[in-house]
Amino acid sequence: MTLEIEQFMCRSDNFGILARDSETGITALVDAPEEQAILEAIKRTGWTPSLLLITHHHADHVEANLALKERFGLTIIGPAKEASKIPGIDRQVNEGDVVRVGNQEARVIETPGHTAGHITFYFAKAGIAFTADTLFALGCGRLFECKPPVMYESLKKLVELPLETVIYCGHEYTESNARFALSVDPTNSALKERAKKIEALRREGRPTLPTTLGEEMATNPFLRCHDPVLRNNLGMKNAADVEVFAEIRKRKDVF
């Protein structure tokens, strides 16, 4: 019994995701960035979704909600805190709620920061987390609606998941994130090696996702605020971890 994943590109850099319970065939779509790309993925796989799991209200994640709901009769599930901004929402969920996709269960983790109501769907048995625009490969989402401490606490929740957790993110930002990460953590050998692999993947037109939590904790500066070398690079040897996070986010915003 597994959760099968089909990841595909939407718009310019969004990821679309179909997640199928192999035992029952029940399929969920994670966010709805673009109708046409999603329809092509459904046709290609033969996986017809009955659920749409929404992580947050931004237009590039909900644009196709209503069209897909009309076509497939989808049940749309999303964050209660953003319900008024999510077209067609049927079920509002909060921290700790459980969402079933066939025989697979996802726990809702509230991960505000990018938006005030952003959520992550964590499938514990499958070892998969859909973090959308909270945690990226080598990055984190911009803080449009929250202050840095809010996102910092959300990331602290995510790093409590098992290191082998497979992370699916909302965008293909990894190559630019790698360049920034190297600017603040240039002596990190794991990061330097990873950056080379990322460059090669993108040169071939291949995606850099999914990643794993363990890989992110070794190379993602936003998850390494405690690291003495990184702190020293920033001139923040004695600062609180949350202050280090805020400084890294500030630098990334203008990088």
Swiss-Prot record:
EC number: 3.1.2.6
Biochemical pathway: Secondary metabolite metabolism; methylglyoxal degradation; (R)-lactate from methylglyoxal: step 2/2
Pfam family, one: HAGH_C
Residues noted as binding Zn(2+) 2 in the record, renumbered to the chain: 60-61, 133, 171
InterPro entries reported for this sequence: Clx_II_MBL (IPR035680), Glyoxalase_II_hydrolase (IPR050110), HAGH_C (IPR032282), Hydroxyacylglutathione_Hdrlase (IPR017782), Metallo-B-lactamas (IPR001279), RibonucZ/Hydroxyglut_hydro (IPR036866)
Keywords: Hydrolase, Metal-binding, Zinc
Superkingdom of the source species: Bacteria
Catalytic activity entry: an S-(2-hydroxyacyl)glutathione + H2O = a 2-hydroxy carboxylate + glutathione + H(+)
GO annotation terms (biological process): methylglyoxal catabolic process to D-lactate via S-lactoyl-glutathione
SMART domains the UniProt entry points to: Lactamase_B
GO MF, one annotated term: hydroxyacylglutathione hydrolase activity
Textual note on the cofactor: Binds 2 Zn(2+) ions per subunit.
Keyword Metal-binding belongs to the record: yes
CDD domains: hydroxyacylglutathione_hydrolase_MBL-fold (cd07723)
Cofactor dependency: Zn(2+)
HAMAP family: Glyoxalase_2
PANTHER family tied to this protein: HYDROXYACYLGLUTATHIONE HYDROLASE, HYDROXYACYLGLUTATHIONE HYDROLASE GLOB
Similarity annotation: Belongs to the metallo-beta-lactamase superfamily. Glyoxalase II family.
Function as written in the Swiss-Prot or TrEMBL entry: Thiolesterase that catalyzes the hydrolysis of S-D-lactoyl-glutathione to form glutathione and D-lactic acid.
Known partners and oligomeric status: Monomer.
Protein name as annotated: Hydroxyacylglutathione hydrolase
UniProt source species: Chelativorans sp. (strain BNC1)
Name of the encoding gene: gloB
